[in-house]
Amino acid sequence: LALSSSASDVYKRQLQAGIEVMRRLTPGKVHLSVRAKAEGQMPMLKGAELHTFAGKHPAGNVGIQIHHIDPVNKGEVVWTVNIQDLAIIGRLFNEGRVDMTKIIAVAGSEIEKPQYCRVVAGARVDSILRGNVKPQKEGDHVRIISGNVLTGTKTPADGFLGFYANQLTVIPEGDKYELLGWAMPRFNKFSVSRSYFSWLCPKKAYDLDTNMNGGERPFVVTGLYEQYLPMDIYPMYLLKACLAGDIDKMENLGIYEVVEEDFALCEFVDPSKIEIQQIIRDGINLMIKEA
């Protein structure tokens, strides 16, 4: 998102003030993570240790970044703040006023014109989408998501944008089913395996809906999770420890280093169709309760 020179300078001052506030709130280091080759004015900010990350999702997840910068151990506390929220904090101390304005992405296959919008945190969804959702055929529906498709929350059209959401997504509702769909070649269905012939077109774009294409299945070892979780842990064993409620094993397998969003991509590709993010959250909650 391009900013004018004057707006960029103002934003830089807000970020610098936010970093100064963070330094006063912690005896530890303040780390600033940005996308490689798109640092902009970030290297000019003082008081924070700069880190760059490149690659596909989940490279941008804060949990992944913490894992590679300074892994969390038992007894340690790490606080994180989004870059736009850092600017809001800086704006508060620079100007003495609470201004919750931020920029969000409005995206998804059912959006007429994908764009960035300047909104106030918690804005009404219909005020953001107004006239920007593609017309639907009779019987078709859309799902509105506060956040992204992997970790966001379903919200009605008259609902509100989540406080922490920086994206509003609209995709087709998967409420249509196929008879014996599993037996069809399905050239237009996405799959990470070679279950469908769509693997012959690796660069093809898909309009994915919310259909899970099946129900929950036995939790089997596939080796898929390790391909989609760039962390030095054993995700399958950690999940099983969470299911068993074995806190000692959870600690040894890295429960302190993860949050549920780190496993979102694993949940998407999981052939067992298990709610992996919920398993991780339940494990974390159990650990906190028993601490």
Predicted regions and their residues:
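Single conserved hydrophobic/aromatic residue that forms the stacking wall/gate
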Residues: 2-7, 11
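Hydrophobic alpha-helical positions that pack around
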Residues: 25-138, 142-183, 189-192, 196-198
